[in-house]
């Protein structure tokens, strides 16, 4: 059994295996605290995320289980990868397990911090957007919608390598998908208008908002609230077409949209005066009201603007779709705990098998 050590970070106890040392806080969110650490086994810096009280409710239990399943399944250069997961011996798996620890790569910074510190030059904007779309092509091919894409969920290292992270809100591709998700500035209009019938296109809209922010140096649609957010969008992109308005299910929302003054779509080249024509063309194809007319990640990669980096032989898709069979399950917390424990055991068994195979190959050389 692994030896565990304790550390106090911001008043929170981290009980981790002795494999990890030099814990330093790097971020805190609604669901957990993230620390950097040194992996003694690989001599690499890693991020250790402690998920607080993941089994306090069935909803949070499913969220934690979903994030682990996704991290195990998604294996791509532009998606954050899982390198370890464990529970502390103080937490009882059946009765009161109150935390779990996910260990992933540590990239040093995120796009939000970069954007608030300095303007980005064209080649960096192109390279970052290329990697975002390359990651989305893979994620979408796995049957997964991120749903909460924003600059703080885009991690970057000193080599400008980029990885999409935080799949806690990710969902199955589902034409009847519902829910109030995503940070408002980057939220697609179909989520605000209908709360239903949305799919992978919501991530393309979010990526378009991030692209615009990289070009402009500030958020494109900084709405103060739900209503103001949509109004700001129409000021730039004009009134939604009738076929989009007709999909609105809520009478109150429909009444609000129809009450707005008729607006014409503004030319993005006047808004983004320093952007070249290919950048404007790609941005316009991403920020389209009708999700079915929005460009796909695959087609965006082939766009002229991303030509310096586009390589169709090195933009892989998922080998198989993600298994969402658990997602509609309405299970008690104890069942989610057992399922989570099973996934952790499976992860370590697979990792041990891979290590053994690599050892055999090495010894056979």
Swiss-Prot record:
InterPro entries: Kinase-like_dom_sf, MAP_kinase, MAP_kinase_CS, MAPK_Sty1/Hog1, Prot_kinase_dom, Protein_kinase_ATP_BS, Ser/Thr_kinase_AS. Residues 20-306 form the Protein kinase domain. A motif (TXY) lies at residues 178-180. It is found in: Cytoplasm; Nucleus. One of its GO terms (cellular component) is nucleus. It comes from the Eukaryota. GO terms for molecular function: ATP binding; MAP kinase activity. Its EC number is 2.7.11.24. The active site is at residue 148. GO terms for biological process: stress-activated MAPK cascade. Its main location: cytoplasm. Its cofactor is Mg(2+). It catalyses: L-seryl-[protein] + ATP = O-phospho-L-seryl-[protein] + ADP + H(+); L-threonyl-[protein] + ATP = O-phospho-L-threonyl-[protein] + ADP + H(+). Keywords: ATP-binding, Cytoplasm, Kinase, Magnesium, Nucleotide-binding, Nucleus, Serine/threonine-protein kinase, Transcription, Transcription regulation, Transferase, Virulence. It is an enzyme of class 2 (transferase). Disruption phenotype: Leads to reduced growth rate and conidiation but shows increased sensitivities to SDS, Congo red, and hyperosmotic stress. Results in reduced expression of the stress response-related genes ATF1 and SKN7. Moreover, NaCl treatment fails to stimulate the accumulation of sorbitol and glycerol. Reduces the expression of the ustyloxin biosynthesis cluster USTA gene. Finally, reduces toxicity on shoot growth in rice seed germination assays. ATP binds at residues 26-34, 49. Belongs to the protein kinase superfamily. Ser/Thr protein kinase family. MAP kinase subfamily. HOG1 sub-subfamily. The TXY motif contains the threonine and tyrosine residues whose phosphorylation activates the MAP kinases. Proline-directed serine/threonine-protein kinase involved in a signal transduction pathway that is activated by changes in the osmolarity of the extracellular environment. Controls osmotic regulation of transcription of target genes. Involved in environmental stress response, hyphal growth, conidiation and possibly secondary metabolism such as ustiloxin biosynthesis or the biosynthesis of other phytotoxic compounds that are inhibitory to rice shoot growth during seed germination. Plays a key role in responses to cell wall and membrane stresses but not oxidative stress. This is Mitogen-activated protein kinase HOG1.
């Amino acid at each position: 059994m692994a030896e565990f050590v304790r550390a106090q970070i911001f008043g929170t106890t981290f009980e981790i295996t002795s494999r990890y040392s030099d814990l330093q806080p790097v971020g805190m969110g609604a669901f957990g605290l993230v620390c950097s650490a040194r992996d003694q086994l690989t001599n690499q810096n890693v991020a250790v995320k402690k998920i607080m009280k993941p089994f306090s409710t069935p909803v949070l239990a499913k969220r934690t289980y979903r994030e682990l399943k996704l991290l195990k399944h998604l294996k791509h250069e532009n998606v954050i990868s899982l390198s370890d997961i464990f529970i502390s011996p103080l937490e009882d798996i059946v009765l009161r397990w109150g935390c779990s620890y996910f260990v992933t790569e540590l990239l040093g910074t995120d796009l939000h911090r970069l954007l608030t510190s300095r303007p980005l030059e064209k080649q960096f904007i192109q390279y970052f957007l290329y990697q975002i779309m390359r990651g989305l092509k893979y994620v979408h091919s796995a049957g997964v919608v991120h749903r909460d894409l924003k600059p703080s969920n885009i991690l970057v290292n000193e080599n400008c390598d980029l990885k999409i992270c935080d799949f806690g809100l990710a969902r199955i591709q589902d034409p009847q998908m519902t829910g109030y998700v995503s940070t408002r500035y980057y939220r697609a209009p179909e989520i605000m208008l209908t709360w239903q019938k949305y799919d992978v296109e919501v991530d393309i809209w979010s990526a378009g908002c991030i692209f615009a922010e990289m070009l402009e140096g500030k958020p494109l649609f900084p709405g103060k609230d739900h209503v103001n957010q949509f109004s700001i969008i129409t000021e730039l992109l004009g009134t939604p077409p009738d076929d989009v308005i007709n999909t609105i299910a809520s009478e109150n929302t429909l009444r609000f949209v129809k009450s707005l003054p008729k607006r014409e779509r503004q030319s993005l080249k006047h808004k983004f005066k320093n952007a070249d024509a290919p950048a404007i063309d790609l941005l316009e194809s991403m920020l389209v009201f009708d999700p079915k007319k929005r460009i796909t990640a695959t087609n965006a990669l082939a766009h002229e603007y991303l030509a310096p980096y586009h390589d169709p032989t090195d933009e892989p898709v998922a080998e198989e779709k993600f298994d969402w069979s658990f997602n509609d399950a309405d299970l008690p917390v104890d069942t989610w705990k057992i399922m989570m424990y099973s996934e952790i055991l499976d992860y370590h068994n697979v990792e041990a098998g891979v290590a053994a195979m690599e050892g055999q190959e090495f010894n056979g050389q």
